[in-house]
Amino acid sequence: MKTFTAKPSNIKREWLLIDATDKTLGRLATEVAMILRGKNKPEYTPHMDTGDYVVIVNAEKVAVTGNKRKAKTYYHHTGYIGGIKSVSFEKLIATHPERAIEKAVRGMLPRTPLGRTMFKKLKVYAGEAHPHTAQQPKAHNI
């Protein structure tokens, strides 16, 4: 029997809606990364983007275990000499709550052009409202 490979014309993408309220950040990010890659589908093909679109709401209510709310630190560099910046999880959630989930999921996707196209299918919103009602996303429980 020949190995199955998905064809771009045969890939059916769905829109999934996930509520991040009281979900642990890492466990949520793992499930979302699997959906974005398409590993939850039988037609998964490693060199193709077979994943679904994911809309995450209530990003500001995501949970972390232990002392991570105060102790977890995110770093980025401005590009200038001595330009390393850091922000705690607590401050990041207060200012840009969607970035914490985006950074967690981004770290679980491949660091290739294919991984970047997979990441573009992730839509994260701080509150309950989102502009994707026309796509009729299906509620997905984690």
UniProtKB/Swiss-Prot annotation:
It holds the Pfam family Ribosomal_L13. GO terms for biological process: negative regulation of translation; translation. GO terms for cellular component: cytosolic large ribosomal subunit. Keywords: Ribonucleoprotein, Ribosomal protein. InterPro entries: Ribosomal_uL13 (IPR005822), Ribosomal_uL13_bac-type (IPR005823), Ribosomal_uL13_CS (IPR023563), Ribosomal_uL13_sf (IPR036899). PROSITE patterns: RIBOSOMAL_L13. Gene3D superfamilies: Ribosomal protein L13. GO terms for molecular function: mRNA binding; structural constituent of ribosome. Belongs to the universal ribosomal protein uL13 family. Part of the 50S ribosomal subunit. This protein is one of the early assembly proteins of the 50S ribosomal subunit, although it is not seen to bind rRNA by itself. It is important during the early stages of 50S assembly. PANTHER family: LARGE RIBOSOMAL SUBUNIT PROTEIN UL13M (PTHR11545:SF2), RIBOSOMAL PROTEIN L13 (PTHR11545). This is Large ribosomal subunit protein uL13. It comes from Francisella tularensis subsp. holarctica (strain LVS). The gene is rplM.
